[in-house]
């Protein structure tokens, strides 16, 4: 693989530190996980083999708890929504509650301080708790029951009423409408609050401002939002208009509170059926959103993948995605009507190999799908980000649906950055997503970032749970997930460091470090393996990948001018002859070192693969090397003879193989699990996958290095395309070059789409674990050759490599939460 590391910045970096990260590794202290406390005091936890065990919970116990959550979705009760359902009367009798079990639950679930809601021990009072408490008080007063509960609830509200006035406090969706609406109901029933009238007037003033303000969306989005919070509008709401948002399950936006308010104000029989079914299933309390199984389980799967621990739950994840797939093909509203849920489902299903088209995403092809929705009214960055990410999972170059979604969502996200109206934490997420598209992210690097930003239960006490109209804890077992992720990341770093030491020894043993021209970068090349094939059990695949990365880069330097024509031809003949190399001999010590490094390493890899492959596959490795050096020799001859290929196609006939992905993937594929038959290596599918990966790498390399290569007398695709479209020299050279870059980007995008389609499709001769290696390679190449902001610098790559292999996790926890790890 040809890395863009021949640039001046890397040369300076190598001269400053010839051993690269190996030197730092030898000086590195034992691994520790750095913990930042709430007061900013940094502590360190020395971790043994099992961090989870040292913190009081065995690894298998962590897995069992997470596995249980995956299998059984546990709905978080919403005191707010339960209170609204409790206010629904029996039809024909306004003096009798239709759902007495909801009243009973409210009376049994008041907290000692008089409040209701998701106020975990130690959490601060927030607007959600205040809203839930007021709703429960009003519900009890509606049926003239629970006088003591009402008294204690009113006392709590009086003590904390200031929270409702604090505009800096995070609020549930529509709080200024829902809270004031309940306050209006409460005063109408004769309830008296131990607060000043001016404070109550202040709440109604905030309500007036909310009703009059222009939000981020359109008139359509405002109507949808007002229907969503309709329980807070009372007589101001057009209840017939609300029914336009009724779903097939007869709810209003899957919201029990909005549906209950609709029944109360209009006695809608179909909406009542939704509530009857809901209360019957859950035996009393209701959640803030129902149904939410699909959303909750998708979030769990997505979280486990982002934290790097999904491999522990492959069976459960497969079952969940099978269920999601069934919902998708049946176009179920639970999945399809929510922008974020639909986009997440599309991304996960497609990346897991389910055969789905982008037709289900067609509803979001116009920006109006966002602007005219509740998401637009609330400026919902999370849903927009999910939509943007899903648009990048393109398997067809001419997929106009995903192309249009990606175009407008990227533009809106960029506008959010420019306007600076997005919360700081969300802003960082937007900037990161725009800088690193899905096809240019490396899993282990992403996972470390996610682990360090993951919120524990302790943090949620301070920062609050995800808020809809009321607090929503979801199905995430926060502390268990974090503990398992920290443990596995730490364990993998220990493995990575040992493998890096072994690779350093291999470099010395092969005598590659005696070659003055060799760019020996075991740390950087190993990073590309560890960041994609991160599970500890893929050790041999990582080592084979890295060894061949180092070898191909060294051989490329040799053919780029450090070897004479005689030496280059000699090396090509030796590799073609392979076991019969003794008949040819070596033209120089340099050639001898190179050949034996390739030959002996390939034989060792093949021998290690015998138990998995049930045969010796060294011939396939040797053949991949033959294709590679043959292409390199052709390019070298062009350079020495000052020959310019007449077409891009002629150039690519050699340049694709010379990019040298072949030896890397062929060697690593032997260790990823499945047995690879002769049929696999000879199949059109395998050859096409290899050609696409090499093409992607070659085009990325050409687009970044064409200016330097022109000065060196080398040709590449950008220059050739510009020459062929310059009108015989009559056109502008600059314009021709820009047109060439645009065309090559189009070809690159098409190749990337084709590769993803082959990698994710169901069936095929090449086993899925092997196919994934080609996608990993593509992601590495896009990351390495990233043009934006000059990211690919020596310092940038060094920092990324250190983050995965060396640097301890920076996990932010409150001191009282340390024991949960």
Curated annotation (Swiss-Prot):
Annotated motif DDXXD motif, positions: 556-560
Disulfide bonds: none
Free-text comment on the cofactor: Binds 3 Mg(2+) ions per subunit.
Residues engaged in binding Mg(2+) 1: 556, 560
Domain of life: Eukaryota
GO molecular function, one term: magnesium ion binding
Binding annotation for Mg(2+) 2: 556, 560
Residues the record lists as binding Mg(2+) 3: 701, 705, 709
Pathway: Secondary metabolite biosynthesis; terpenoid biosynthesis
Record's function text: Involved in the biosynthesis of ent-kaurene diterpenoids natural products. Catalyzes the conversion of ent-copalyl diphosphate to the phytoalexin precursor ent-isokaur-15-ene.
Domain notes: The Asp-Asp-Xaa-Xaa-Asp/Glu (DDXXD/E) motif is important for the catalytic activity, presumably through binding to Mg(2+).
Miscellaneous note of the record: Phytoalexins are diterpenoid secondary metabolites involved in the defense mechanism of the plant and produced in response to attack (by a pathogen, elicitor or UV irradiation).
Protein name: Ent-isokaur-15-ene synthase
Organism: Oryza sativa subsp. indica (Rice)
Primary gene name: KSL5
């Amino acid at each position: 693989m040809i890395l863009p590391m021949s640039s001046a910045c890397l040369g300076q970096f190598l001269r400053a530190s010839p051993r690269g990260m190996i030197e730092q590794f030898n000086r590195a202290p034992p691994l520790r996980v750095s913990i930042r406390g709430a007061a900013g005091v940094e502590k360190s936890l020395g971790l043994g083999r099992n961090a989870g065990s040292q913190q009081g919970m065995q690894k298998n116990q962590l897995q069992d708890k997470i596995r249980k959550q995956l299998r059984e979705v546990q709905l978080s009760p919403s005191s707010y929504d339960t209170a609204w359902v409790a206010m629904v009367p029996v039809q024909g009798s306004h003096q009798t509650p239709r759902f007495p079990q909801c009243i009973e639950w409210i009376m049994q679930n008041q907290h000692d301080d008089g409040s209701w809601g998701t106020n975990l021990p130690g959490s601060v009072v927030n607007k959600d708790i205040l809203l839930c408490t007021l709703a429960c008080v009003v519900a009890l007063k509606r049926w003239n029951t629970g006088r003591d509960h009402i008294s204690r609830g009113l006392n709590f509200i009086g003590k904390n009423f200031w929270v409702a006035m604090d505009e800096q406090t995070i609020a549930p969706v529509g709080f200024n409408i829902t809270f004031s609406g309940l306050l209006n109901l409460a005063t109408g029933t004769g309830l008296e609050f131990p607060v000043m009238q001016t404070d109550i007037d202040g709440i109604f003033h905030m309500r007036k401002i909310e009703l009059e303000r222009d939000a981020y969306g359109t008139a359509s989005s405002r109507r949808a939002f007002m229907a969503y919070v309709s329980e807070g509008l009372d007589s101001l709401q057009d209840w017939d208009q609300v029914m336009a948002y009724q779903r097939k399950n007869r709810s209003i936006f899957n919201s029990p509170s909005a549906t209950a308010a609709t029944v109360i104000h209009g006695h809608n029989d179909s909406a009542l059926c939704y509530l009857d079914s809901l209360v019957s299933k859950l035996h009393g309390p209701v959640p803030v959103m129902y149904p939410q199984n699909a959303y909750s389980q998708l979030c769990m799967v997505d979280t486990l993948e982002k934290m790097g621990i999904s491999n522990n739950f492959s069976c459960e994840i497969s079952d969940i995605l099978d269920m999601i797939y069934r919902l998708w093909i049946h176009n179920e509203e639970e999945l399809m009507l929510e922008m974020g849920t639909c986009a997440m489902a599309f991304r996960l299903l497609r990346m897991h190999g389910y055969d789905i088209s982008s037709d289900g995403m067609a509803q979001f092809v116009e920006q109006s799908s966002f602007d005219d929705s509740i998401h637009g009214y609330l400026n919902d960055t999370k849903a927009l980000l999910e939509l943007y990410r899903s648009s990048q999972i393109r398997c067809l170059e001419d997929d106009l649906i995903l192309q249009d979604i990606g175009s407008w969502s990227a533009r809106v996200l960029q506008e959010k950055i420019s306007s600076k109206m997005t919360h700081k934490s969300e802003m960082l997420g937007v900037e990161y997503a725009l800088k690193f598209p899905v096809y240019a992210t490396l899993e282990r690097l992403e996972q470390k970032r996610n682990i360090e930003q993951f919120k524990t239960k302790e943090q949620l006490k301070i920062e609050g749970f995800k808020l809809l109209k009321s607090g929503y804890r979801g199905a995430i077992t926060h502390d268990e997930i974090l503990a398992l992720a920290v443990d596995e990341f730490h364990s993998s770093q220990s493995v990575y460091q040992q493998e890096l030491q072994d690779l350093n020894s291999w470099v010395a043993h092969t005598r590659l470090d005696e070659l003055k021209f060799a760019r020996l970068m075991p740390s950087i090349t190993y990073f590309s393996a560890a960041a994609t094939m991160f599970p500890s059990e893929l050790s041999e695949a990582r080592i084979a990948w890295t060894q061949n990365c180092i070898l191909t880069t060294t051989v490329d330097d040799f053919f780029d001018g450090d070897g004479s024509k005689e030496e280059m031809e000699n090396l090509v003949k030796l590799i073609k002859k392979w076991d019969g190399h003794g008949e040819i001999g070596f033209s120089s010590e340099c050639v001898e070192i190179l050949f034996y490094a390739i030959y002996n390493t390939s034989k060792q890899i093949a021998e290690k693969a015998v138990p998995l492959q049930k045969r010796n596959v060294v011939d396939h490795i040797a053949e991949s090397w033959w294709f590679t050096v043959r292409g390199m020799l052709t390019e070298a001859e062009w350079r020495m003879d000052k020959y310019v290929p007449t077409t891009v196609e002629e150039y690519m006939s050699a340049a694709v193989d010379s990019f040298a992905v072949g030896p890397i993937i062929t060697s690593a594929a032997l260790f990823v699990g499945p047995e690879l038959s002769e049929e696999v290596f000879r199949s059109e599918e395998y050859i096409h996958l290899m050609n696409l990966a090499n093409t992607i790498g070659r085009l990325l390399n050409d687009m970044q290095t064409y200016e330097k290569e022109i000065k060196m007398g080398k040709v590449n695709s950008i220059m050739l395309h510009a020459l062929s479209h310059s009108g015989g020299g009559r056109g502008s050279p600059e314009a021709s070059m820009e047109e060439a870059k645009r065309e090559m980007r189009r070809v690159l995008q098409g190749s990337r789409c084709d590769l993803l389609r082959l990698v994710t499709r169901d069936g095929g001769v090449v086993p899925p674990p092997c196919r994934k290696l080609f996608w990993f390679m593509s992601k590495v190449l896009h990351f390495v050759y990233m043009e934006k902001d000059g990211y690919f610098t020596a310092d940038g790559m060094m920092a990324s490599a250190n983050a995965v292999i060396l640097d301890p996790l920076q996990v932010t926890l409150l001191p009282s939460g340390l024991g949960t790890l």
